[in-house]
Amino acid sequence: LRDCAKAYSDEQLVADCDKYASPVTEVERRNGFLLHGKLGAFYARTKYYITDEEILSSISYHTTGRPGMTDLEKAVFLADYLEPFRKQPTTPELNEIRRIAFSDIDKAVYLALQNTLRYLKESGQETDMTTAETYEEYRLKYENE
């Protein structure tokens, strides 16, 4: 369900989010694929009749994360990051993050965010502000380890 809007083009995601879902940031407008979570949450509510706000938030933020995530949001975020059939190149740390996720979900989220930001920087891509804010929350917790 988290990826129910993933097949849409970037242009369609932006147009549909402008029309139906939450406001679209400039980074999201330039990187429409980021919106499949927001639009997916809208469809989960309107097409699949999901009313649980935690589930809807988990769908909405499964790509970017968000500060103050619940355990369910963390689990869905990590499930998306760790799925075995991702198109994005995997990192050498992926198996280690999978292992850590079973004992320390917060640390696994931190490492996933750290790897995501490194990948975006190295590939010259923009970082969504919500992802940056989420990383900062976890960095403050784990930077001295």
Language model: regions and residue ranges:
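Divalent metal-dependent catalytic cores for phosphoryl transfer on phosphate-bearing substrates
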Residues: 1-111
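Charged phosphate-binding loop/patch that engages nucleotide di/tri-phosphates or the phosphate backbone
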Residues: 118-145
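C-terminal beta-signal and terminal closure region of outer-membrane beta-barrel proteins
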Residues: 112-116
